[in-house]
Amino acid sequence: MKKYFLLSALLAALLLLPAALPAQDVKIGVIYPFSGPTAQIGLDHRHAVELVMDIVNTDKYKNWNLPLAKTMGLPNLKGGKVSAVFADHQGKPELGLSEAERLITQEKVTALFGSYHSSVTETASTVSERMKVPFLNAESSSPKLTQRGFKWFFRTSPHDETFSEGMFQALKDLEKKKNMKFQTIAVTYEDTLYGKDSSRIEKELAAKAGYKVVADIPYRRGATSLDSEILKLKAANPDVLFPTSYTSDAILLLQTSKKLDYNPKVIMAQNAGHIDPSFVEAVGKDADGICSRAEFSLDLIKAKPMLKEINDEFKKRTGGRDFSGTSVRCFVGFLVLCDAINRAGSTKPEAIQDALKKTNLPPDQLVTPWRGVKFDDNGQNILVDALVIQYQDKVQRAIWPYNLAGAEMVFPIPRWAERK
């Protein structure tokens, strides 16, 4: 009788214990342009996101020193897997907004990620802010995005102020090295938030550096002709040209420069279209000599050896396309978001928001040339640095800062008539 009583008591106690919790899978809404003029950017970013999910969900890459590479799934969510719901904004801000709403209300995603175009990120993130869902941005560079007082928006990469400061410092360092002085600059830019912010910052930095702005030329994004803009630049004849363009515009800008024999001594581009692999595929060796701020160059492999293996894996998925400055930032950003969700140990928005605020990733766990990832109160990563590349033989070579450089800057850019 006593044994029966003890057994009954034991069974009753076991019934009171909570059942083993199942793995908590995580669904993230990913908003990029998968059609339209910048579709290739979106496709490359999809490959970057899928590579991160493979790193997180399997142990195939456990030898890589990356967050979550050594485990299968999210360990703090019982091995839960990460999946993505991809949405196409086509480069349209209003579509980015509606897709963000759909992903949150219908797809029930845990967080949002995207969206490349600053103008689209601006609208899509207003939805996540209103609905209190974390939004991580990896590559949109308008400074205004982290100056809105938002509590649910986080950006891992530098903004245009950081990037532009790096480009102007690269020019100052070149002046010292060559014992010369630039006098004039010109800015030309597409007419959305990205271009307007970029040109504003460049003009402010030019004034501080003592450079005169001799031309300020906006153009309509997606323009079919840039002849008049190039003729104005040719007449102004600046020492340095600062273009801010998406891919199709960057291609047209260079082709028109060649057609009209416009020969700037230095071209210092604001990333985006000028570092998209589709750009050099379209223009070939005509790209040689162009400089751009960037976050990736194969020259970084010397400082970060694991980058070669990761880039090789990325190339398998893209049909031979290397990481670009934007796709590598997408890779890092999505990994940061997955790491934060794991540290949150929950799919609740408030827990993920808190984990993002506490992010403090060291540089050795990144494939970008940053000092780490740590967000300020505005959601901006404060441990970012700029890199400047130059096309040489159709390859993006790191030329600044000098401690990361893999090549000397070619200066001035050879005139069209001098090229072979």
Tell me the role of every PLM-derived stretch.
Residues 4-11, 17, 22-420:
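Extracytosolic ligand-binding ectodomains
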